[in-house]
């Protein structure tokens, strides 16, 4: 099997994933998964598509990850891994889509408007 690559985005985070056959090692920006994401919840989020397909020990994954915060990065990585797994085996798409791993979450920060302190917040109104 050749190396399969995929891209995942969430908020400002971008994850480029390179999947090859291996032993289940996930390397993010030349660091181990547990070192990059110390939180077990974020590690769980990243591994969700692999666990769903019971493929956690089948593939080695190298990741270039930049932008955003921890949560956005972990969710961008989850999307990228799911897309790469579908490229490897298209029959897995329905199983991953039913869990919501194939959907790009398009929500992002709303821009600040002029004449207001924030996107929705208005300056304090004084009646008198």
UniProtKB/Swiss-Prot annotation:
Keywords: Ribonucleoprotein, Ribosomal protein
GO cellular component, one term: cytosolic small ribosomal subunit
Residue ranges of the region described as Disordered: 97-128
Gene Ontology MF term list: RNA binding; structural constituent of ribosome
GO biological process, one term: translation
Origin: domain of life: Bacteria
UniProt xrefs under InterPro entries: Ribosomal_Su5_D2-typ_SF, Ribosomal_uS9, Ribosomal_uS9_bac/plastid, Ribosomal_uS9_CS, Ribsml_uS5_D2-typ_fold_subgr
Gene3D superfamilies from the UniProt entry: 3.30.230.10
Compositional bias annotation for Basic residues: 114-128
Regions of compositional bias (Basic and acidic residues) in chain numbering: 97-113
SUPFAM superfamilies: Ribosomal protein S5 domain 2-like
UniProt family annotation: Belongs to the universal ribosomal protein uS9 family.
HAMAP family in UniProt: Ribosomal_uS9_B
The protein, known as: Small ribosomal subunit protein uS9
